[in-house]
């Protein structure tokens, strides 16, 4: 997994650093604002139930049940809504030593998540990898879903850059989405139909 993270990060032009090197690795990168149903976190060798008010840390893997949703508010204002049946790895949450930019690295192992880039005291870059793609943004609202059929990404506000692990790159404008099948490049951006867009947003609303 470490080598895969390096390849993904370098493809997006990032410097790879470990969550353990940040003070937030011990104080938490944010907390659970609200939740419905059962959710837990894999932290080291432990599995811990999550509820509103609980802290989350770098290198946690957040998991939701089939009828559960979870909203996380990070220390810098970034909001993450985790949909049902999802596993989301909080790989690292660090400030770059070179330019002071906050670099957030996440991994969507399966399921769906929506990210809302709230006001941040420092510039922020967010990157999420899946089994078929890596998506990155500066400050925007967007969602991403990972299934056995591949990855779907929708830009709600702002631009989202999507790289296929098999090659190819697209930039999504607001309202546009793309799909990345296993072993394929990202499809040409298109405006998602109302039914698909509203369904994805509804599944990431709590």
Located regions from the model:
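N-terminal secretory signal peptides
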Residues: 1-2, 10-18
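Flexible, surface-exposed loop/linker segments and immediately adjacent secondary-structure boundaries
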Residues: 7, 14, 23-61, 65-69, ...
């Amino acid at each position: 997994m470490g080598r895969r993270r390096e390849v993904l990060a370098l493809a997006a032009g990032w410097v790879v650093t470990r969550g353990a090197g940040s003070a937030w690795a011990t104080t938490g990168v944010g907390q659970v604002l609200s939740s419905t149903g059962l959710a837990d976190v894999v932290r080291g060798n432990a599995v811990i139930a999550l509820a509103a008010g609980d802290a989350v840390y770098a290198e946690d893997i957040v998991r939701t049940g089939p009828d559960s949703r979870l909203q996380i508010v990070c220390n810098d204002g970034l909001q993450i809504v985790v949909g049902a049946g999802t596993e989301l790895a909080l790989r690292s949450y660090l400030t770059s030593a070179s330019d002071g930019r906050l670099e957030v690295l996440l991994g969507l192992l399966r399921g769906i998540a929506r990210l809302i880039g709230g006001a941040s005291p420092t510039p922020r870059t967010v990157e999420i990898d899946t089994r078929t793609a890596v998506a990155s943004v500066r400050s925007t609202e967007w969602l991403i879903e990972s299934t056995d059929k591949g990855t779907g990404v929708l830009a709600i506000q702002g631009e989202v850059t999507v790289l296929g692990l098999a090659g190819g790159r697209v930039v999504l404008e607001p309202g546009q989405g793309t799909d990345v099948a296993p072993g394929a490049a990202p499809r040409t951006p298109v405006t998602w139909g109302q039914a698909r867009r509203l369904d994805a947003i509804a599944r990431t609303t709590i």
